[in-house]
C-alpha cells in the first residue's frame, strides 16, 4: 500500500520521493543523500514524455491509513517522428525530448553503514613516530652539515656539540678537495698519513753492506769453504735483481739531483748504522772487504789449458772529502754498499762504468752542494753583516733620539718644577698673610670683649653703689615698691582666673539655653520639623566637648534632617496601629477571606481593657502601651510594643522606629543637659 502511493506520487515530479519513505523504514535510517540514491521495490523508470496538456492525476487517498490505492494509468508513449535524409532541412528543427529506455530492475541492496576506522596499534604508532623522527633527524643533520660549510660560527658549534658532526664535515671537505685538485690527491695518496703514532724501527731494518741470505747467518765465517761458497752463490742469485734495480734507480736519480738548484729532502730511511763524518762513511766498505774470505790468487793457464783472462780488480769505495751534508753522506753510504755487493759478486767488469759514472756524478753533486753552501753562507754573512750594521745604525739613532727626548723631558720637568715652586711659594705667602690677619682680628676682638666686660662690671658696681646710697637715704622705700609690684602681679593672676570662670559659666549657660531651644522647638512643633540649625548651634557652643559630640553623633541623621513626631502624632498613630494589631491577633496562620471578615467583626465586638492590665496577650500589651503614652512615658510604651510577637510586631515596627528616634533625641538632650550641669558644678 505504501509503495503504491509512493509510486503514484513519483509520477508527478521529476525526482522520486523514495527518500521520504526511506525515513519510515527502520533498516534504512541513513543520511538523505544516501537514501535518495537507493532503488526500492517496483521502481522501474518509465520514459519521460512531455505532456503539457495532460493534467496530473492524484491518487484516491494520500493518507497512510488507506487500505489500497489504485495505480495510475500508465502514459502512452508516442512514436518518435523520423525525418528522411532526403528531406533534411538546412536548419535543424528544435530538439525533441530525450526518450530514456526502460531500465531493468535491479535487486535492492540494503544500505551499508560506513565501517568504523580501526584505531592504530601502539607498535604501529611507535614505528611511525620512530620513522618520522629518524627522517627529521637525518634532514636536520644534513642541513646542519651543509650550513656548517657556509657559516663558521655554526661550523664550530656543529662539530663540537653534535655527535659525528666533525667526521661528516671532514668527509665532505675531503670530497670537495679531491674534486677540485685531483692531481694533488694522486700525488699525496702514495704517502702514508701522519697519524701521530710513535714509529718503531726494527733493529735489523735499513740498508746494510751485507747481502741478505736465507741460510745460516754465520756461514761466511765458517771454516767450511764449500758451504760458504754455496750460500754466497744462492744469496747472490737471489739478491742480484734487487741490487741491480736499486743501482739503476739511484743512477737515474743522480742527473735529476744535479739539475735542481736546491736539494729536495728525501724521506728518511731507518738505517742500522748512522754516519757521523765523511771519514767514518767509508768504514763499512773497508770492514766488508777485510771480512770477505781470502780468495785464491790468479794463476796463469798452462800450455794444455785454455786461455783465460785475469779477474778484474775490485771497485774502490767512494771517498768524498768535505762531505758534511747528511744527504751526501747517505748517498755515499748507499753507493759504498752497492760497491761492496758488486765486489762480493765478482761483477766488477759489468758494473764498473756505471759505478764510476755514479761516483763522478756524486762527487759533482757534493761539490755543487759545497759550492751552494759556501755561496749561501757568504750571502748569509753579507746579510747578517748588513743587518748588524743596520741594527747598529738604528740603535745609535734610537740612543740619540732617547737622549734628546730625555734632555727635552728633563728641561720640561725643570721648568715645571720651577713654576710649581713659585706657585707654592705664592700660595704659602697668601696663607701666612691670611693667618696673620685673622690672629690680629682675634686679638682685637678679645681686647674689645675684655674692655666691655670691665665696663659692664664697673656699671654694675656703680648701680649697686647708687642703689645702696638710695636705700640708705629713703629708709627702705625701694623694698616696699617691690612688695607692691608682687601684690599687683598676684591680683592680675586672680583676675585672669576669674575671667576664665566667667567665660566657662557663660558657655555653660549658653549650652543650657541651646539645649532648651532644641527641646522647645521639638515641643512647640505641631508636625515633624528638622532641627539641624539648633544642633549646629549647640555643637559650636560646646567647643569640641567630647561628651556633647558623642551625644549628637548618636542621633539618627533622619531624625534631625526630617524631624521627629510629636506626642499627639505618636498617640494618634498608635491608635490606628492598635486597631490593625487587634485584627491580626485574631487571625490564624493560614487565614482566608472568611477568617479576615470574622476577625474584623470580632475586633469591633471585643471589650477593651483599661489601665495597666495584667497579662501577656496582645490586648493587655496594647492597653498598657496606651496608658504609658497618655502619661508621656515613651520608654515603657516602646518596651511594651517590643514585647509583641508575630504579625503584631511586624505591623507595629514602623511606629516603634519613630518612638525610638524620639527617645534617642530626648536621651541625647538629657546627656547634654547633664554635662552642662556638671560643668557648672565644677566651677562652683
From Swiss-Prot:
GO cellular component: MICOS complex
Pfam assignment, any one: Mitofilin
Region (Disordered): 62-102, 189-224, 287-317
Transit peptide: 1-41
Side of membrane Mitochondrial intermembrane, spans: 149-684
Residue ranges of the TM segments: 126-148
Record's compositionally biased regions (Low complexity): 75-89
UniProt keyword Membrane present: yes
Oligomer and partners: Component of the mitochondrial contact site and cristae organizing system (MICOS) complex.
Family (UniProt): Belongs to the MICOS complex subunit Mic60 family.
Protein name (Swiss-Prot/TrEMBL): MICOS complex subunit MIC60
Amino acid at each position: 500500500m505504501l509503495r503504491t502511493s509512493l509510486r503514484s506520487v513519483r509520477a508527478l515530479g521529476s525526482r522520486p520521493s523514495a527518500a521520504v519513505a526511506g525515513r519510515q523504514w527502520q533498516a534504512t535510517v541513513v543520511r538523505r543523500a544516501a537514501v535518495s540514491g537507493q532503488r526500492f521495490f517496483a521502481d522501474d523508470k518509465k520514459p519521460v514524455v512531455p505532456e503539457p496538456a495532460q493534467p496530473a492525476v492524484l491518487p484516491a487517498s494520500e493518507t497512510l491509513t488507506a487500505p489500497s490505492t489504485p495505480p495510475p494509468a500508465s502514459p502512452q508513449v508516442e512514436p518518435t517522428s523520423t525525418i528522411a535524409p532526403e528531406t533534411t532541412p538546412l536548419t535543424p528543427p528544435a530538439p525533441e525530448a530525450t526518450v530514456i529506455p526502460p531500465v531493468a530492475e535491479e535487486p535492492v541492496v540494503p544500505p551499508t553503514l560506513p565501517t568504523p576506522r580501526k584505531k592504530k596499534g601502539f607498535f604501529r604508532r611507535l614505528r611511525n613516530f620512530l620513522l618520522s623522527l629518524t627522517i627529521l633527524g637525518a634532514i636536520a643533520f644534513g642541513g646542519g652539515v651543509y650550513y656548517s660549510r657556509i657559516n663558521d660560527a655554526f661550523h664550530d658549534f656543529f662539530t663540537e656539540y653534535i655527535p659525528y658532526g666533525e667526521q661528516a664535515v671532514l668527509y665532505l671537505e675531503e670530497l670537495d678537495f679531491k674534486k677540485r685538485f685531483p692531481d694533488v690527491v694522486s700525488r699525496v695518496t702514495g704517502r702514508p698519513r701522519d697519524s701521530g703514532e710513535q714509529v718503531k724501527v726494527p733493529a735489523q731494518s735499513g740498508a746494510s753492506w751485507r747481502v741478505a741470505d736465507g741460510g745460516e747467518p754465520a756461514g761466511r765465517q765458517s771454516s767450511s769453504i764449500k758451504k760458504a761458497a754455496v750460500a754466497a752463490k744462492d744469496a747472490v742469485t737471489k739478491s742480484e735483481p734487487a741490487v741491480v734495480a736499486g743501482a739503476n734507480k739511484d743512477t737515474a736519480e743522480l742527473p735529476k739531483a744535479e739539475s735542481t738548484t736546491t736539494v729536495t729532502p728525501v724521506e728518511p730511511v731507518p738505517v742500522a748504522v748512522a754516519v757521523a763524518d765523511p771519514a767514518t762513511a767509508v768504514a763499512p766498505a773497508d770492514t766488508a772487504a777485510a771480512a770477505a774470505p781470502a780468495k785464491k790468487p790468479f794463476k796463469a793457464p798452462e800450455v794444455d789449458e785454455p786461455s783465460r783472462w785475469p779477474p778484474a780488480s775490485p771497485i774502490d769505495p767512494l771517498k768524498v772529502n768535505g762531505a758534511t751534508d747528511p744527504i751526501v753522506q747517505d748517498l755515499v753510504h748507499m753507493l759504498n754498499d752497492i760497491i761492496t755487493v758488486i765486489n762480493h759478486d765478482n761483477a766488477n767488469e759489468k758494473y764498473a762504468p756505471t759505478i764510476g759514472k755514479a761516483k763522478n756524478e756524486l762527487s759533482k753533486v757534493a761539490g755543487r752542494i759545497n759550492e751552494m753552501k759556501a755561496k749561501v753562507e757568504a750571502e748569509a754573512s753579507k746579510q747578517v753583516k748588513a743587518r748588524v750594521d743596520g741594527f747598529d745604525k738604528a740603535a745609535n739613532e734610537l740612543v740619540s733620539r732617547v737622549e734628546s727626548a730625555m734632555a727635552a723631558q728633563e728641561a720640561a720637568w725643570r721648568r715645571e718644577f720651577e713654576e710649581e715652586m713659585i706657585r707654592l711659594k705664592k700660595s704659602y705667602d697668601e696663607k701666612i698673610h691670611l693667618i696673620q690677619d685673622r690672629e690680629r682680628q682675634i686679638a682685637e676682638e678679645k681686647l674689645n670683649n675684655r674692655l666691655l666686660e670691665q665696663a659692664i662690671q664697673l656699671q654694675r658696681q656703680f648701680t649697686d653703689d647708687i642703689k645702696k646710697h638710695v636705700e640708705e637715704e629713703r629708709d627702705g622705700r625701694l623694698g616696699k615698691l617691690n612688695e607692691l609690684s608682687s601684690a599687683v602681679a598676684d591680683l592680675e593672676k586672680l583676675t585672669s582666673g576669674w575671667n576664665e570662670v566667667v567665660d566657662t559659666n557663660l558657655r555653660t549657660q549658653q549650652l543650657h539655653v541651646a539645649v532648651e531651644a532644641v527641646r522647645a522647638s521639638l515641643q512647640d512643633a505641631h508636625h515633624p520639623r528638622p532641627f539641624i540649625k539648633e544642633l549646629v548651634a549647640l555643637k559650636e557652643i560646646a567647643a569640641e566637648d567630647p561628651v556633647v559630640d558623642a551625644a549628637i553623633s548618636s542621633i539618627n541623621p533622619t531624625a534631625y534632617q526630617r524631624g521627629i513626631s510629636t506626642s499627639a502624632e505618636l498617640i494618634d498613630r498608635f491608635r490606628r496601629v492598635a486597631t490593625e494589631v487587634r485584627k491580626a491577633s485574631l487571625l490564624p496562620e493560614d487565614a482566608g477571606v472568611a477568617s479576615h471578615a470574622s476577625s474584623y467583626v470580632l475586633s469591633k465586638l471585643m471589650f477593651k481593657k483599661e489601665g495597666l492590665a495584667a497579662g501577656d496577650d496582645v490586648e493587655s500589651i496594647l492597653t498598657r502601651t496606651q496608658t504609658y503614652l497618655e502619661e508621656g512615658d515613651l520608654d515603657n510604651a516602646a518596651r511594651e510594643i517590643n514585647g509583641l510577637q508575630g504579625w503584631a510586631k511586624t505591623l507595629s515596627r514602623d511606629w516603634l522606629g519613630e518612638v525610638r528616634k524620639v527617645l534617642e533625641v530626648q536621651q541625647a538632650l538629657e546627656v547634654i543637659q547633664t554635662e552642662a550641669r556638671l560643668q557648672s558644678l565644677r566651677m562652683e
